[in-house]
Amino acid sequence: TTVLAADDLSGVAAILDGVRRIQASGVPYPRIEIVFTVGEEPQLRGSRHYDFTQLQSKLGFALDSPGRIGRVVNAAPSTAQLYYDVYGKSAHAGNAPEKGINALVVSSKILASINEGRLDPESTANFAICSAGNATNVVCDHVHVEGETRSSCHEKMEAYCEYFEKFCHDTVEGTGAKIETRVDKVYRCFRVDENSATINLMRKVFSEMGIEMTVERGGGGMDANRLNEHGVECVGLATGYAQNHTPNEYVYVDDLIKSGEMVQKIILNYEA
């Protein structure tokens, strides 16, 4: 989003620095696997095509979370992309508007009434992309809308997807317009127990560094979603950045430097 790109080049920098520290120290270290994915934004597209059978590791750490160093994200939501297309009927807007069916008006009925925003404490829905028409003197005959839903409960996410499709079709019924809906279930939620091997390892790491650790649920997806789905117990680790996805993104330099040390200690404290 910004030239800084702390989300998530701060994580890349921390990994490279941690490995550099290990190599420079000359101390023996266990076998490690490092995966740099492309296209993490949006919808974890890169890791969607990764061959996870290449990995031997059973524990993992995704350096891709906002917040001060010491923050561990042990849960992230399931997410689905939502799409619909409303097809109306074009007509001259000045000579014969009554002969047309305005797809934009029909679409507005959906967006004005559908349940969206904060659905419950662990679920959200958002509609953010809309394209329609190309001239003001033509009754709009096509609208394309894109949105998403996410929830820390996979079943709630699936339930909203069903609600979305039914609501759209029910709303369009009787208007003369037609609608097509599509749902793409992008990635599955995960929750790692606070007494798991990954979090216990991080307790040891942060204790050695004199940093207070917090364990929290995250609101966004990350490659840890895919790793957990494929049998690698993985948590997210903060690297000191904030206000990501905005032009005001920044990173605490001290946290960034400490993140390299954190990676070094993760490697040295890992027990196969």
Please identify what each model-predicted range represents:
Residues T1-A6, S90-A96, G133, T246, ...:
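A short glycine/serine-rich beta->alpha loop
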Residues R71-V73, A91-E98, N134, C189:
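A short glycine-threonine-serine/GTX helix/turn-capping micro-motif
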Residues T1-E41, A80-V86, N95-E116, G147, ...:
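Alpha-helical metal-binding/catalytic segments enriched in His/Glu/Asp
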Residues A103-A272:
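Metal-dependent amide/peptide-bond hydrolase catalytic core
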Residues T2-P77, A125-F127, T136-N137, V145-E148, ...:
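Acidic/histidine-rich catalytic neighborhood of metal-dependent amide-processing enzymes
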Residues T37, D64, D85-K89, R150-S152, ...:
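Solvent-exposed residues in well-ordered beta-strands and their adjoining turns
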Residues V72-D85, K204, V235:
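Acidic-glycine-rich active-site phosphate/pyrophosphate-binding loop
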Residues K58-A62, Y83, C234-G236:
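Short glycine-aspartate micro-motif
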